[in-house]
Structure formats: C-alpha cells, structure tokens
Amino acid sequence: MATDEVNAAIPFTVFLLVSVMFYGLFDNLSGEDEGSGLDLIDPVWDYEHDTESGYGSVTGGFVYRGSNVPALYGKYVYGDFILGAIWSLELVDGKYVNELVYDTKANTSLTGNNRIPISSFGESESGELFFSDRSTGRIFTLNQTGSGEVTVESFKPDISIPLMIGLYNAGDSSNRIFAIEQVGRIHSFEIDGDSNDTTLLLDIVNNVESTDWEQGLLGLAFDPDFKNNGVFFITYTIPGDTLRLSKFIGDNETILLEIDQPYVNHNGGHIAFGPDGYLYVGLGDGGKYNDAFDHAQNLKTLKGSLLRLDVSGETYSIPSDNPFVGNSKDYKEEIFAYGFRNPWMFSFDRENGDLWVGDVGQDKWEEIDIVVAGGNYGWAFREGKQCFDSPFEHYDGHSCGEIDGWTFGAFMYERILLNLPLMIAFL
C-alpha cells in the first residue's frame, strides 16, 4: 500500500476506534447487549498450562460407560494434546475430583516418542474408549489389570492413519471404528478380529483446504438411522478460509452451511448427534488470538458457539425449542450455547444425556464444561474460571460478571487494535 493510502486510512481507522468506544460506553449501559450484566457459567473443571512449556490444549472425551475399565465407569475421561496426559473427572460430594489416569510422557514405550499428542477420543458402540495419536497415526485403547490399574494399550498397531484427528462409531451394529484423516479421508476398520484391513468411506482431499494444522476435514457424525439410509455429515475447511457443513449419501454431497472465517485457526468443526436427534456443531471464535472480533460474546454471529440443527430434511432447519428462537434482537437462532474459544471435542453421556465440552484455552487455562441451553461460557471475558488477562490490561481486575460500559468499550478497542493490519489492508 502506498504511503498516501496509509495516511488516508488513518483518520477512518481513528473514527472506527472512537465509534466503537462510544458504542461500548453508551449502548451497553442499557444492559441489553453482549458485555453487560453477564451471567457466565463456570466450567466444571479448569487446569493450568504446563509450567515448563507454557502450553496446553484440551481434547474433550467421554463419560465412560463400557465394561473393560470398571475403575472409570461413570467418570468423564479427557486428555491434552500438548501434555499427552489423560485424566478423569468425577462428581464427589458436590465437587468435581480430577485424577490422572495415564501420563504418556512417563510411559514412552508405547511409541518411543516423548508423549502421545492426543488428538481425539472415540467411543465404540459398547462404550469402550479409544484415542488417536496425530503424529504416528496410531490408535490406543484403555484397559484395566486384575489389580485395578488402568493401562493404555496399542490397538491394532499395524493400522496407521496419518494426521488422524477423529474416531467414531456409526451406531449401525457393525462394530466398526471410523477414523478421520485430516487431509480429507475417512477410513473404517473392524474392532474385533485380527484383520488390519481398512476401508475408505470418503475421499475429498481435492476439496479440502488443510494448509494450517487447524484446517482440514474436522468432524464426522452418522445419522441416527445410518444403518438404513447411509446418511452421514462432515465438516471441513475449503479454500478461502471457510468452514463447510455437508450431508453425504455415498459420494453425493449436499452443502448445508458455510461459515466464513477471518483467520485460519479456531474453526472448531466437531459435530455430534444428541439424544434428541438434532445435530450439534461446535464453532471456534474465528481465530488469531484474544477473540480478535469479539465473536464469542456476540449472538449475532455463529462463531464461538455451539449450534443445534435439525438436519432431517434437504436443508437444515432450526428446532423450535432452541433458546434464542423468536428473539427480537437478530440473535442467531441456530445457537444453543456460546462463549467458546475453540470447542474440541464434545460428547453426550449415553446414560443421562449431559453434554460435555472441552474448550481449548489461550494463555494459561484449559476448561471442561457441561453445557446447557442458552448458556454463556465466558470467553473472552474469562479463560477457565479466571478473568482473562488481556495483554492490553484494559479490564483486568473487573468482575467477569459485571462488565460495565467503559470496560466493554476498552475490550472492543483492543479488538480493533488486534485487527488494524487487516483493516488497513482492506482499505
């Protein structure tokens, strides 16, 4: 951009900054829009990033309902991609208790690596848990010794699927596991028996944008009647930084929804059917960092939220009991809950229907949520149970649940600063 163009853009940029500040001050004093009078729902658990590396990245799991590991029955099992650890959560006397199940850093004999980067958990039809190693493409399962020790075992070690980020069952009594290869393939294999053969369900590599490690084929969900109708759903990123939700019967695709992304990361993309028969879709805040566009607290955008869709027809429709149906403020009626940074992954307890979400944090904290209709889970006013420490420190020290006009204006001002290069480039 020429110097005179930059100079011309500066006054307009300043105008935008001032406008947003005054919008935050006056509009939010009414208490009717995002950022004012927040009623944030606490995560059931949060944990701090590794003290040495400063990183962490939660991978949501399942409430264990299988029979092979009695010690974990009824506990929520989840892991961390960066730390390579697996934990369990259990409600005891009204408080959640977190226990380390397995530390792959301390047990490197399984792969020879420093850790297993746990990219996904999967559940068989009988309720047994598997998890994937994105780096080696191998699959592992949980088991229990006669003495009660929970162990991790390699599952069919001759099967290796590169960049594996998802494990699913089809609910069709076939006892197969389906594995997502991030570049755009879905493979299946039998759980029982000695066969290491894999079958290709879908190959859309030529349609998928997977340049960034958070892009690619991201989600898979089988129609509750898949055994009879062969219908399944996927999410994947396409060129132009767009997340697409599609319905498939064989190779025949019907595009249901496309969400433009301002950046390549924080697409979310995990999908699952709930016990109510509706499809739930997890969406990240659109990326970069600090929720650069304030998407997660803005009910007028789908980003940073969990959607609930009726996909029984040729196009999707909105269930009549979604929490924002019929609102007068142009809030997106597809939204079931909001205030998420990058939900990865979520599941329903097959016994009581509770919806558990692992939401990936940024600076210090990862969190586990039990999600309810209409709930606000706090990002980017809060990370885990803590007030989010903005690098600009405009609103440090304020109560996360009592964001006033000045504070919200500063919050929005920060977002303009974060996106200033984008704005100038656009101008």
Model regions and ranges:
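Beta-propeller domains
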Residues: 176-202
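Blade-loop segments of beta-propeller domains
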Residues: 195-222
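Surface loop/turn motifs at the tips and blade-to-blade linkers of beta-strand repeat domains
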Residues: 49-53, 110-113, 155-160, 202-206, ...
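Conserved beta-strand position repeated across blades of beta-propeller domains
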Residues: 62, 122, 165-168, 221, ...
